[in-house]
Regions:
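Conserved long alpha-helical elements within nucleotide-processing catalytic cores of c-di-GMP signaling
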Residues: 1-22, 29-59, 65-77, 81-89, ...
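Cyclic nucleotide signaling catalytic output domains
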Residues: 64, 90, 94, 100, ...
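Hydrophobic pocket-lining residues within nucleotide cofactor-binding pockets
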Residues: 28, 79, 117, 152, ...
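Residue-level signal for alpha-helix termini/capping positions
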Residues: 12-15, 100, 171
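PAS and PAS-like sensory/regulatory domains
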Residues: 8, 104-110, 175
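Active-site core of bacterial EAL-family cyclic-dinucleotide phosphodiesterase domains
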Residues: 158-187
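Sensory input modules used in signal transduction
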Residues: 25, 76, 114-116, 179
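PAS-family sensory domain
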Residues: 19-21, 62, 143, 172-175
Length: 187
């Protein structure tokens, strides 16, 4: 994809210049409700209007790409954590402004995860993965902007491993239910 090509180029440029870059992963809140309630045609119009709004909010050198459905990624060259957080907050705010489409007003929200190169990742693929992890952390709060941290990545991996182990234990009937009454000592 174009984003992957540009991300690859930006990583090489950052290496050559001893610089940095940020990748922002945006996921829309409440878009499914619009699609389900108003139809995919209106949903597509909302995405087009939002894409135009975000396009106007871009700064020189930035690249915005729709990843599918209601997800977007923004590549911000020569950006550290402060710049990336400011861009993330600005985009979440721009998305939250009501959109007029087909004579109706639609309110969306967004959650934003951010990964930084080279501090969070060794290459573009890892940068995308870490931005995705940070976005899911932000989505837990809705409307939040979160930087990737190794602790969040480790915590997510532990939760996924635990969920897999629980599914396996259920499938193999290794879990048993025990009734354990709880009483207060004061009673």
């Amino acid at each position: 994809s174009l984003l992957q090509e540009r991300l690859h180029e930006a990583v090489h440029r950052a290496d050559a210049e001893a610089g940095a870059l940020a990748l922002l992963y945006l996921d829309l809140d409440r878009f499914k409700e619009i699609n389900d309630g108003c139809g995919h045609g209106v949903g597509d119009q909302v995405l087009q209007a939002l894409g135009a709004r975000l396009g106007r909010a871009l700064q020189p050198g930035e690249l915005l790409a729709r990843m599918g459905g209601d997800e977007f990624m923004l590549l911000v060259p020569r950006a550290g954590s402060e710049t990336a957080m400011a861009r993330g907050r600005a985009l979440v705010e721009a998305i939250s402004e009501p959109l007029g489409v087909s004579g109706r007003s639609f309110s969306l929200g967004a959650s934003c995860g951010i990964s930084l190169y080279p501090s969070d990742a060794l290459d573009g693929a890892e940068l995308m993965k870490h931005a995705d992890i940070a976005m899911y952390e932000a989505k837990a709060v809705r409307g939040a902007v979160r930087l990737y941290s190794r602790e969040v990545g480790t915590s997510l991996n532990r939760r996924l491993l635990l969920a897999d182990r629980l599914k396996l234990a259920l499938a193999e009937r290794r879990l048993r239910l025990h009734y354990q009454p709880q009483i207060r000592l004061a009673d």
